[in-house]
From Swiss-Prot:
Reactions the enzyme catalyzes: trans-aconitate + S-adenosyl-L-methionine = (E)-3-(methoxycarbonyl)pent-2-enedioate + S-adenosyl-L-homocysteine
One term of GO molecular function: trans-aconitate 2-methyltransferase activity
Protein name: Trans-aconitate 2-methyltransferase
NCBIfam families: PRK01683.1 (NF002463)
Compartments where located: Cytoplasm
Family: Belongs to the methyltransferase superfamily. Tam family.
Primary role: Catalyzes the S-adenosylmethionine monomethyl esterification of trans-aconitate.
The gene coding this protein: tam
Keywords: Cytoplasm, Methyltransferase, S-adenosyl-L-methionine, Transferase
Major location (coarse): cytoplasm
Catalytic activity, EC: 2.1.1.144
Presence of keyword Transferase: yes
Length: 256
């Protein structure tokens, strides 16, 4: 599945806010080495550099289009193409930062444990993941997938990502290797111009695997069906806008 940096950037301010909120809870005054895991177009990497300076900060992602955008944004920063499912730092890092990436990896609990081993003493693993599979925006994806002439493509194997584990699972797995683990949820309510804007948002992330599976032949009809469902489930506010409710989970583990 190929990502689109330009589609992602349409709502960059809203997508960057959780990264900013996550970084604000990282209890490091200084660092020698920080890696932005799943750096995307470099918006979260830029936040790390703004706080700690550029020395020792790098990013990695598995998507060439995202990496190209990141390198244009931060030409003096090293960005590497890598698979987070198997990647491990070659030397201890003070900060491993992951904004909205690990929800795509079903075995991320195992990966978190491995990443803790790649931290320096007192180092931090900081993770944010969307926790929105129960929201109307994502329920409508499944309804559309199984309700149109493209439904045969979804019958044998679905594309819905796995639900996140409960906070207790993250805590139990991480505290064995950490001095402190903080876990919290934040629910963002993003004012969107209309239902079509919600569709544009998810076209850059959660809706992508559905569109890919439906195929180019059905793309426009799939989007029209999905938009109709979104219009029914997101009522207009007094100013004509709609509110996109967006829960996210945050995890900060300090190695000790």
């Amino acid at each position: 599945m190929a990502w689109s940096a330009s589609q992602y950037a349409k709502f960059e301010d809203e997508r960057t806010r959780p990264a900013r909120d996550l970084l604000a809870q990282v209890p490091l005054q200084h660092l020698r080495r920080a890696i932005d895991l799943g750096c995307g177009p470099g918006n979260s990497t830029e936040l790390i550099i703004e706080r700690y300076g550029a020395d020792g900060v790098s990013g990695l992602d598995s998507d060439a289009n995202m990496l190209e955008a990141a390198r244009k944004r931060l030409p003096g920063t090293a960005f590497v193409e890598a698979d987070l499912g198997s990647w491990q730092p070659t030397e201890p890092a003070d900060l491993l930062f992951a904004n909205a990436v690990f929800q795509w990896l079903p075995d991320h609990l195992d990966i978190f444990e491995r990443l803790m081993d790649g931290l320096s003493e007192g180092g931090v693993l900081a993770v944010q993941m969307p926790d929105n599979l129960g929201e109307p925006s994502h329920l409508a994806m499944e309804e559309t997938a199984h309700g149109g002439p493209w439904k045969a493509a979804f019958e044998e194997k679905g594309v819905r990502r796995q639900p996140l584990a409960p906070p207790s699972s993250y805590y139990s797995r991480l505290i064995a290797k950490a001095a402190r683990v903080d876990i919290w949820h934040t629910i963002y309510n993003h004012p969107m111009a209309d239902a079509a804007a919600i569709v544009e948002w998810v076209k850059g992330t959660g809706l992508m695997p559905y569109l890919a599976r439906a195929g180019e032949k059905h793309r426009e009809a799939f989007l029209a069906d999905y938009l109709e469902r979104i219009e029914k489930t997101y009522p207009k506010m007094s100013d004509g806008r709609v509110l996109l409710r967006f829960p996210r989970i945050f995890i900060v583990a300090v190695k000790g």
